[in-house]
Amino acid sequence: MTGAAACLAGFEGITVVIHGSSGCYYYPATLLHAPLHGTFILENEVIFGSGDRLREVIGDLSNKGNRIAVVTTCVPSVLGEDIKSLFGENDVIIVDSPGFVGEMETGYHKALSALSPVTDPGRLGINIDGVSLSDPFYEGNIQEISRILRNAMIPIGTIFCRDTSENIGHASPLTVGTNEDFKSGVGEYIGGTLGIPALRETCKKLAARYTYANMDPVFNEIDKQEERIIHACDKFLRRYDPPGVAIFAGAAYALFAADSLKRYLDAQILIVGTRNDPPVLPNMDYRVEKLTGLEEVRDTITALEPDLVIGSSFERSLSSGRAFLGIIPPLRGQFRLAYPPLVGVGGTLHFIENVLNACIDKRA
């Protein structure tokens, strides 16, 4: 449900209604910081049906000029209410996305499918996908990849999912990604931008596809900034041993963190615990498995005794004073005003910088 709301609320011109209880509304509302609406159904509506309440809420919103999207939660789904029949031919987007259908990524993709994106062969530029309002780095990721593309003189197409609703219907034929857990499936996928190696390969493909692009400044920046990363990590390793690291995140961010720390810091990757199903990759250098329960995570941290834990506030609460770095929600107990990226050149710089400082702070 939260993933579906994150997808839909990312598009200007779509009004999102969470059809469920107050609890179903408040979690995405506080996580996404987006203008969501709720039906706040009560006990009698669970028994006698919630259609009247939904019609009332949508009636109040229908004169605002936006398309309305309804995300159904567990109670309406379990009751089997026929939500679509309530609106007939009206242009209401219905996304059945109760919590039991899967992870956040499942709801996101269900909502994106309901929007029916269309590519426009005549549109120049390239789409940016993998953007979710649930991601604490989404704003910085957009800014970083937009900056790189503009430096290469490549126009930007549709941003999935942080754009206007009109742009859903005429996306560019080509796409680059920021977070493959939220891959859009729109157009031809050129490659990802998580980590320096992936960014470099994607830029090579962009240079081949966009003959008018000026990629030299981009490649020069990649090489220069990677040297800075190598120098900083070498300086750290002259004073400290490589850290043992336990990583808990979505598969894309978790594997980025593991690959970057192994490449630049020679870190011992003790575990890569993913919240969603990890991709099947050959020749993995470390243990990768899906871990979705706090008890599993607690037992893993206790058994492996890592120097550094990477994850969310949940993992921080289990880290017992170890060095910690947050890369996935929720990230509680801190102010977040700036828009740091995790993708592109700036994302790797930001990530490695924070890892080094977290480790030094705990060893000082």
Question: Positions of the model-derived regions?
Answer:
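An N-terminal assembly and electron-transfer interface module characteristic of large anaerobic redox
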Residues: M1-A364
